[in-house]
Amino acid sequence: MSERIVPSGDVELWSDDFGDPADPALLLVMGGNLSALGWPDEFARRLADGGLHVIRYDHRDTGRSTTRDFAAHPYGFGELAADAVAVLDGWGVDRAHVVGLSMGATITQVIALDHHDRLSSLTMLLGGGLDIDFDANIERVMRGEPTLDGLPGPQQPFLDALALMNQPAEGRAAEVAKRVSKWRILSGTGVPFDDAEYARWEERAIDHAGGVLAEPYAHYSLTLPPPSRAAELREVTVPTLVIQAEHDPIAPAPHGKHLAGLIPTARLAEIPGMGHALPSSVHGPLAEVILAHTRSAA
């Protein structure tokens, strides 16, 4: 395991790796406002033990990557997709299996459209299609209105987690406890959730960010890609896997099926009991389906 700082335009991105660099590369793209440590070490090692060179990185404005005022230095999903490619360049990787979670699933769709030559395969989990306006859906759900796309909007557990995240926490212990409570809500009750495990991970995430207690927030200011870009997904030819979680409160299960329907090469898998989180109880089945996909794409 080693660390590397890679340039992407005028920002620097922190990254690290697991496994043998001689193995096929797999890039992990985390969700919004989360650093690379949103991918637990244990999960990354499980993928590496399956024969992959696993690389993860801090998005800009998270962890140890460049952090700036978003209003003064705005960016969009095009830049975030270019960041992912810059990480591949920084590790000397021409093509990689790319796995994106939540907002990372949106980024990977943009990678598939704008940088398809860098992909060996594509995996998207806990996300939705480019034609879904999640921001508008959240607003409509909060007003008690149905979504305009006919798919279920974010569920009450997500709204509960949002409310919790907006509550101030006094000191490190309170901040860690708040984060653990957030993840317990998002994980749901379908799979075991270990508070001590998540507390340990959040302690590491805070240390990784230099002891800063406040969670990053810049990605809340992002504008989603134009919904019209979803039509371009019909041209994607790379082997694609869409993974939906049975109890995802942010992108409920039909969203995965909808996303898979936008890409001719996509197949759909579902992780029973899983919510919008990565407790160790889902690492085994999740890694198994990802490894099977990358092997079939080789």
From Swiss-Prot:
<feature type="active site">
    <location>
        <position position="248"/>
    </location>
</feature>
<comment type="similarity">
    <text>Belongs to the AB hydrolase superfamily. Hydrolase RdmC family.</text>
</comment>
<keyword id="KW-0378">Hydrolase</keyword>
<feature type="active site">
    <location>
        <position position="276"/>
    </location>
</feature>
<dbReference type="InterPro" id="IPR000073">
    <property type="entry name" value="AB_hydrolase_1"/>
</dbReference>
<feature type="active site">
    <location>
        <position position="102"/>
    </location>
</feature>
<feature type="domain" description="AB hydrolase-1">
    <location>
        <begin position="24"/>
        <end position="277"/>
    </location>
</feature>
<protein>
    <recommendedName>
        <fullName>Aclacinomycin methylesterase RdmC</fullName>
        <ecNumber>3.1.1.95</ecNumber>
    </recommendedName>
</protein>
<comment type="function">
    <text>Involved in the biosynthesis of the anthracycline aclacinomycin which is an aromatic polyketide antibiotic that exhibits high cytotoxicity and is widely applied in the chemotherapy of a variety of cancers.</text>
</comment>
<comment type="subunit">
    <text>Monomer.</text>
</comment>
<dbReference type="GO" id="GO:0102530">
    <property type="term" value="F:aclacinomycin T methylesterase activity"/>
</dbReference>
<dbReference type="GO" id="GO:0004806">
    <property type="term" value="F:triacylglycerol lipase activity"/>
</dbReference>
<dbReference type="GO" id="GO:0046503">
    <property type="term" value="P:glycerolipid catabolic process"/>
</dbReference>
<comment type="pathway">
    <text>Antibiotic biosynthesis; aclacinomycin biosynthesis.</text>
</comment>
<dbReference type="GO" id="GO:0017000">
    <property type="term" value="P:antibiotic biosynthetic process"/>
</dbReference>
<dbReference type="InterPro" id="IPR029058">
    <property type="entry name" value="AB_hydrolase_fold"/>
</dbReference>
<dbReference type="InterPro" id="IPR050471">
    <property type="entry name" value="AB_hydrolase"/>
</dbReference>
<keyword id="KW-0045">Antibiotic biosynthesis</keyword>
<dbReference type="Pfam" id="PF00561">
    <property type="entry name" value="Abhydrolase_1"/>
</dbReference>
